[in-house]
């Protein structure tokens, strides 16, 4: 059974380890000498690590696929400032060698408490049409089960089971504060956008021991898929105001903020502008939190910058640990 997790690997730098990991991705790449090597991303519920198998991988590569759990032996090293696992041996794990829960990252928050908070927010709506629309989703048992479980992304922010619900509840909270600060904002419209903006991810993503995109997700994308889901629910709500329908759909269509970021329309109403920026803020704050946790797990010093964070195009500094009083040296 599993004893060493990704979060533990920093303790074993320049040492050999044997453990089990789930395969998040794999591909054969060319070496400078004309040969090939196998590049893998391995992971468990505590994180992921880039891995390389330079030799003797031909037979092993035919035994497993993305999403499988494998047993590996390799050396923990550091490449470009990040921990990496150089593999010597690899084989697929048998069913009795692992517990699935060890390999699937999941929210640290109570899912039922998150769900109750979301329902409570919807119950407080004064606009009964918007309330009926959102309830048509939350009262759908298939939707509710998927929404409780889905990740918000494959690798970036909230990339764990329950991550989408955690993100939405967090976003609803800061949207509530924004609506209080800007009284001209339509609070119920803003919260409706916050709750529904990413529902297309329930069909865009697939999740298990690894997170990936469905074929429809790759070809269509969660924004368009989310609009389709909203249209289906609106068809069951006769008398729904057409002007509200237009505004709700605009919120979803524009929530990425820019055409080059995947939104077919720019935000053109105050609620859509707020949703775009607050969604981005929540995602970035959680990305930073995850990077600080990874930095610490890999043995990084509290007062130093992290490695380059690709999704934010910069390194980061954790001010909470940077400003923490230093313990006096032991005599």
Regions inferred by a protein language model and the residue ranges of each:
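Extended, charge-rich, solvent-exposed interface segments
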Residues: 84-149, 225
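Structural detector for short beta-strands of small beta-barrel domains
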Residues: 14-32
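Acidic, carboxylate-rich catalytic segments that either coordinate divalent cations
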Residues: 271-331
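Short, acidic/hydrophobic/Gly-rich beta-strand patch recurrent on exposed beta strands
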Residues: 39-44, 207
């Amino acid at each position: 059974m599993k004893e060493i997790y990704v979060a533990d690997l920093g303790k074993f730098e320049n040492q050999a380890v044997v453990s089990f990991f789930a395969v998040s991705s794999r591909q054969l790449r060319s070496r400078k000498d004309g040969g090939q090597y196998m590049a893998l991303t391995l992971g468990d519920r505590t994180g992921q690590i880039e891995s390389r198998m330079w030799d003797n991988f031909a037979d092993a590569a035919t035994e497993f696929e993305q999403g499988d759990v494998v047993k590996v032996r390799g050396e923990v090293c550091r490449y470009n400032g990040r921990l990496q696992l150089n593999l010597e041996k690899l084989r697929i794990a048998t069913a009795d060698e692992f517990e699935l829960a060890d390999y699937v990252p999941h929210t640290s928050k109570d899912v039922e408490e998150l769900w109750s908070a979301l329902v409570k927010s919807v119950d407080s709506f004064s606009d009964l049409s918007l309330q009926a629309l959102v309830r048509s989703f939350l009262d759908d048992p298939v939707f509710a089960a998927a929404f409780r479980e889905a990740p918000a992304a494959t690798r970036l922010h909230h990339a764990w089971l329950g991550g989408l619900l955690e993100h939405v509840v967090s976003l609803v909270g800061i949207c509530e504060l924004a609506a209080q600060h800007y009284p001209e904002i339509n609070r119920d419209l803003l919260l409706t956008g916050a709750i529904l903006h990413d529902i297309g991810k329930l069909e865009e993503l697939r999740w298990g021991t690894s997170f990936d995109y469905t074929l429809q997700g790759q070809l269509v994308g969660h924004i368009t898929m989310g609009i389709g889901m909203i249209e289906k629910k609106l068809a069951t709500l006769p008398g729904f105001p057409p002007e509200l329908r237009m505004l709700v759909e605009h919120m979803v269509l524009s929530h990425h903020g820019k055409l080059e970021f995947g939104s077919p329309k720019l935000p053109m109403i105050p609620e859509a502008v707020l949703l775009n920026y607050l969604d981005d803020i929540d995602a970035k704050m959680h990305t930073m939190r995850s990077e600080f946790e990874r930095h610490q797990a890999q043995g990084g010093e509290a007062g130093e910058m992290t490695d380059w964070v690709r999704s934010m195009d910069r390194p980061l500094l954790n001010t909470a640990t940077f400003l923490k009083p230093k313990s006096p040296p032991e005599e």
